[in-house]
Amino acid sequence: MSLLIFSAILAVLFFWAVGAYNRLVLLRAGVAKQFAAVDAQLLRVLVWLQGNLPASMRDMLSEMEEAALPEALLKNERDLNLLKILEDLSDSLDVARTQPLSAIAMQKVNQDRLALAAWAKAEVRAGQTGEPTWFIEPLPYKFDRLKAQAWPLMDAYNQAVTKYNDAVTQFPASMLAKQVKFLPAQMLDNADLLA
């Protein structure tokens, strides 16, 4: 009789573990799917911005991997900073694409995305004070529009992360998550530095 009870308890635990694991895997897949949409929109922003670079900067951007940038050819420090930000954001998106639940990868995406927004804000201010800049109307408007299209996607990603993180930290699924090394995911910061 006790063997039957023990077997029943083991069976319940086994089926619970399989169900909990499947739920966690589905939630992880949901986070990855939502990040794919965010990634696609951020890539649109990158491609659009790279396509609107002055020709001399576009040529340098394509040669960045082969040699150091000739700083003398750049108009100002802000242009050099933009090329670095674009390269960093592209690299961080590449990493996050392969590890959409990695907190470190998402922190880097957040950092680089916000650095791009800060660059745009500095360029708009520079244009308003009469400093030379190629980032003039209608470019800031279009940049803001592309960024705004990413916000609902980032909200959907953050909601998926919240569901996943709740499941990973909720007892008793948290014990299973620790066993299979499912860590909480990082949310995207959807603060707007241009507001």
Residue ranges and their predicted role:
Residues 2-195:
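A helix-centric hydrophobic-segment signal that preferentially recognizes long
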